[in-house]
Design a protein with these regions (language model features):
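Conserved N-terminal/central alpha/beta ligand/cofactor-binding core
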Residues: 27-149
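N-terminal Rossmann-like FAD-binding beta1-loop-alpha1 element of flavoenzymes
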Residues: 1-24
Length: 149
């Protein structure tokens, strides 16, 4: 995987869990997550019967360029992904009863954003880095791939 942000880390974890030996290559040092952009939160259909409204909001916000199959898959996996991160140690802001606090965000017709406040990106990256370490995923830091576009 090229990069060390949340997407690359999660992809490497999936590879390791399926029996392959992934390698993370990043131009910055370990822990820098140079490719990680700040995120407002994690969207999941936690207060909905299913993810169909989430999928429709995503398709509506993305317009004609939206891959409907990908939108359905990603929106459908939101709750399971959030639960996985919690099992691995992510501490979400919660509401009474212990469920994740959900709030509104542009493009969503209902409250479905959740997270760790301003530290969501940092905390998700930290959790995924811990999981990568537990799996012995090799990392090359301070490495540049010349000619890579």
């Amino acid at each position: 995987m090229v990069g060390a942000g949340p997407a690359a880390l999660r992809a490497a974890i999936a590879c390791a869990d399926s029996g392959t030996s992934p390698l993370l290559i990043d131009a910055s040092g370990v822990g820098s997550a140079s490719g990680a952009h700040s995120i407002a939160g994690i969207a999941a259909s936690i207060d909905e019967l299913d993810s169909s409204a989430h999928r429709e909001d995503t398709i509506s916000a993305g317009g004609e360029s939206t891959d409907k199959i990908s939108a359905a898959r990603v929106c459908g996996e939101g709750v399971a992904t959030l639960a996985e991160l919690e099992r691995w140690g992510l501490v979400l802001r919660t509401r009474e009863g212990g469920l994740p606090h959900a709030y509104s965000a542009p493009g969503h017709s209902v409250d479905r954003m959740t997270g760790c406040g301003d530290s969501t990106t940092r905390e998700v990256t930290r959790i995924l880095e811990e999981q990568a370490i537990k799996r012995g995923i090799q990392r090359w830091a301070d490495t540049y791939l010349y000619g890579w576009q």
